[in-house]
Amino acid sequence: MSLIKEFKAFASRGNVIDMAVGIIIGAAFGKIVSSFVADVIMPPIGIILGGVNFSDLSIVLQAAQGDAPSVVIAYGKFIQTVIDFTIIAFAIFMGLKAINTLKRKEEEAPKAPPAPTKEEELLSEIRDLLKAQQEK
């Protein structure tokens, strides 16, 4: 039973939950970027390069024989995946850069010392009066 309690304590910690949310959002963001690259970026690039569909670019190593499909190196899909990765990596870099900038600004702004309480003010006045009496 203690194993279950330990797991609940582990899973309910803020860092684990934040990580899970990050993974889910990251997966969704990856799908969005993949669609953006495949459906928005690559078609115009293909038109510019003479009507090339990048997802179809491949080198046939062995032609199809009977029921066996052909063996190919699909380098067009690889190019799309590299572009996906580059966009995702750049977005993560920009996000981390923004977070680091905000953290630096927080660190640079020194906190004002807290105002003295009434007790501290009274004690300071008493101290000053005692010093004045000793000097006489």
UniProtKB/Swiss-Prot annotation:
GO terms for cellular component: plasma membrane. GO terms for molecular function: mechanosensitive monoatomic ion channel activity. It is a multi-pass membrane protein. Gene3D superfamilies: Large-conductance mechanosensitive channel, MscL, domain 1 (1.10.1200.120). It is found in: Cell inner membrane. Keywords: Cell inner membrane, Cell membrane, Ion channel, Ion transport, Membrane, Transmembrane, Transmembrane helix, Transport. It comes from the Bacteria. The chain crosses the membrane at residues 9-29, 79-99. Homopentamer. Belongs to the MscL family. HAMAP family: MscL. Channel that opens in response to stretch forces in the membrane lipid bilayer. May participate in the regulation of osmotic pressure changes within the cell. This is Large-conductance mechanosensitive channel. The lineage of its organism: Bacteria, Pseudomonadati, Pseudomonadota, Gammaproteobacteria, Alteromonadales.
